[in-house]
Amino acid sequence: MTTNKRTLLCAGLTATAAPAAKATGLAAAAKAGVAPSVAGDAVTAAAEDFGHLIHRKPQAVLKPASAADIAELMSWAASRGLRVAARGQGHSVFGRVMAEGGVVLDMTSMRTIHDVQPDRISVDAGATWSAVLDAALPHGLTPPVLTNYLELSVGGTLVVGGIGPTTLRYGMQTDNVLALDVVTGDGRQLTCSPNSNPDLFDAIRAGLGQCGIITRATLRLVPAPQRVRRFNLFYADLRSLTADQRTVLTDGRFDQLQGAILPDGAGAWRYQLEGAVHHDGQAAPDNDAVLAGLSDQRSAAVISDLTYSEDLSAFARLESLLRSNGQWFHPHPWLLTFLRGSNAEQLAGDILAELNNSDVGPFGRITYYPMFTKALHTPLVRMPDESVAFPFNLIRIPASKDAAKADQMVAGNRVVYKRLRDAGGILYPVSAFPMSQNDWKDHFGPRWSLLRDAKQRYDPLATLTPGYTMF
C-alpha cells in the first residue's frame, strides 16, 4: 500500500481509495449508501485479540494512511450507525478493540517516526514502543516509562495508561505525553495538549478510546541510562517480600521496581523482588550497599549487569518461548488491579491462599509491588486514595487451550475484582471480565462526569470503541 492510499479489505477483494477529494473506495460507498459485506483474513484477525476469549467479527477492516482517512471513515460510519474501533497490535484481552458488525481501523498502517528532538519525539499512533526506542536511543534518549512488553502500539497504551518499572518515578506513559493529534468520534481532526483543547487531552489519555482516535503523539524523552544493574531477590513469604518492597520504595535505592509471586511448579509460590539501578559503566553500583538491610534469601539472588537495550529485551525472550510452546496463542484471562497500600499484604495473602499454580500457569505470575500514587497525574487513570498502591495482577498463561477452564478464570476474575473493589482496590482496565455501565461509573468515580461530558461533545452518537460496553 502506498503512503497516499488506504485499503478497505472486503468480500475477499481489495478496494483502493485515493485521497478524500476523490469519490472512490470508501467515499464512493458512502455516496452510494452501500456498506459492503466483508470476509477474508483481515476480518478474521480483527475478530480475535491476544485474550482469545471474545470473538466479534467486523463488517470491514480499514488500513488508513492518514488522519484524513480516519476522519472520512468516522463521518461515513456515524451516518450509518456503524461502530468503529482502532486496533494497534491487538493485545487487548477481552474484545475491547473489536467492533462487531462495524469497522476496525488497523493502525499498523500508520507507524511513522516523524521527529526526534532533545526532549521529545513525534510518532504515529500505530508505531510500537520498540520502534520509538530504536529511534530515540541513537540520540542517547528514551521515553521515561516503557511497558515490559515493547511490541505494543503507542496509541494502544496511551488509551489505558501504560505502566512500567519506572512508574514509581515518572508515572504512567500518559503522564509523559506532550501533545496528541486526534480524530474525534464525530470526525474532527484536532490537536490537544495541556494548553490546547485540554478537555479533550484529559479525555483521550486513559479514556479507553471513547472520545477519539489518536493518530499522532508527541512524547517526552529523557537521557537514557547506559547500563542497568538488575537485582532479582527471593523471599520466604509474602510478609518479608512486602516489608523489603516498602523499604526500597521509601529510600529510593532502585531506579526500577517491580515484584512478583511465581508458581514454583510444585504447588507452592516463590516471592520475588525485581529492582534495578541505572549507571554509566564508570561508577557501577556497589552490590553490598544496594542490598544493605534487606532480608532476602541472599544465596538465591540473581544479579546481572546489562546494557539498557539488553535489559529491555527480557520480555521478548519470554515471548519467543511462549510462541515456541504454543502458549502465546492460548487464552489469556488476565486481571489487573491496584490495591490500597494499607491492606495490600492482607488482601493479596487472602487471595493467594485460594489460588494454586494452575490458576496462573507455569509461565504466568502474580504481579505485586508498591508504587507512589503521587507520580501519577492523568485524570482518568484511577488509583486508590492513598499515597502508596500495589499493582496486583493475575497474569494467567494457561498451559492448555481449554475453553471451559478459561471461562472459569474469567468468572473468577469478576469475583476477585468485586472483592478487591469492596476493599478499596481499583481496576486497571486491561482485564478479562465483562463490565456494565454501572461498573464503569463506579470505576471512574468522581471522574465519570469528565468522560461522560467529553463523550457527548466529541462522540455524541457513541460510534467509538464499543468493546467496553460503556455508553
State where each predicted segment sits.
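Substrate-recognition/cap regions that form aromatic- and gly/pro-loop-enriched pockets
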Residues: 327-434, 442-444
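N-terminal secretory signal peptides and thylakoid transit peptides that target proteins
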Residues: 1-15
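Short glycine/threonine-rich loop-to-helix capping motif typified by GTGT followed
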Residues: 18, 267-269, 315-326, 373-386, ...
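Structural signature of FAD isoalloxazine-binding scaffolds in flavoprotein oxidoreductases
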Residues: 63, 93-114, 166-186, 213-217
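C-terminal segment of N-terminal export signals and the immediately downstream linker at the start
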Residues: 1-2, 20-59, 65-68, 72-75, ...
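C-terminal substrate-binding/cap subdomain adjacent to the FAD-binding core in PCMH-type
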Residues: 13, 178-346, 362
